[in-house]
Swiss-Prot record:
Binding site for ATP: D6, S7, G8, N9, T10, N11, T12, V13, T133
Similarity comment: Belongs to the type III pantothenate kinase family.
Catalytic activity: (R)-pantothenate + ATP = (R)-4'-phosphopantothenate + ADP + H(+)
Protein name as it appears in the record: Type III pantothenate kinase
Subunit structure as annotated in this protein's UniProt entry: Homodimer.
Length: 257
């Protein structure tokens, strides 16, 4: 079985795949100071609850946008699963797609993994929107090449910034407002963030499609994707497992024939 690890800025997701079937998925706050032993004990306990054991894992793959986490994640794979991990972004890992950028080394591993999964699943041309710590828009052409995109502040990051930088604005949770015109502070904040991001999504999708010069299918992933997809026709598909499935695809592509 394959242990796939997606280490993001906010959370790190661990998933076990048996072929195409996902046998378990667990999430922890990303912390570069968390040791391999701490992660190993935690993960093995959760695997046991799903009927999985340490010996079931025979391969591992890591994608991380936080370089400081990679060492301990490597140690986790070596020490607890006796598996040298495949690490997305390293020269010996073939993604199977072109990266049409001036500085390919600057692209986050998660964005490339999403591009791989999106092209394999839906073909192109595509826009992939990932609602994470940042909200990213990534363009994949019909041949599967990663063409770049746009990066905006994440929804929760924007809400937190409003609270931290403004003396009278409270910390609020994102939600769909009942009205555009808020009659109190919290409804006004929810309207501004939620509907503002709907406008951001629609505006960027329109501009990207116009610049690309062809109709594009829009795939959304990340925890907030359903909340925003219900408010706009700009998003055609929600794919919760896009990043993890991308890791599965990349691992298979790098196996000996």
């Amino acid at each position: 079985m394959l242990l796939a690890i997606d280490s993001g800025n906010t959370n790190t997701v661990f998933a076990v795949y048996d072929g195409d079937a996902k046998r378990g998925e667990w999430r922890a706050a990303t912390n570069a100071n968390r040791t391999a032993d701490e992660m190993g004990v935690w993960l093995l306990q959760l695997m046991t609850l799903e009927g999985l054991s340490q010996g079931d894992i025979d391969a591992t793959i890591i994608a991380s946008v936080v370089p400081a986490t990679v060492f301990n994640l490597r140690m986790l794979c070596h020490r607890y699963f006796h598996s040298p991990p495949m690490v997305v972004g390293e020269p010996d890992v073939d993604l199977g797609i072109g990266i049409l950028l001036e500085r390919p080394d600057e692209v986050g591993a998660d964005r490339l993994v999403n591009a791989v999964a999106a092209h394999e699943t839906y073909r192109g041309p595509l826009i992939v929107i990932d609602f994470g710590t940042a909200t990213t828009f990534d363009v994949v052409d019909e041949e599967g090449n990663y063409c770049g995109g746009a990066i905006a502040p994440g929804v929760n990051l924007s809400l937190e910034a409003l609270h931290m930088a403004s003396a009278q604005l409270p910390r609020v949770a994102i939600g769909r407002p009942r009205t555009v015109i808020g009659k109190a502070t919290i409804p006004a904040m929810k309207s501004g963030i939620y509907l503002g991001y709907v406008g951001l999504i629609e505006g960027l999708v329109k501009r990207i499609s116009e610049e690309f010069g062809a109709p594009m299918r829009v795939i959304a992933t990340g925890g907030l994707a359903p909340l925003f997809a219900e408010a706009t026709d700009a998003i055609q598909t929600i794919d919760d497992d896009l990043t993890l499935r991308g890791l599965l695809i990349i691992h298979r592509r790098n196996q000996p024939d």
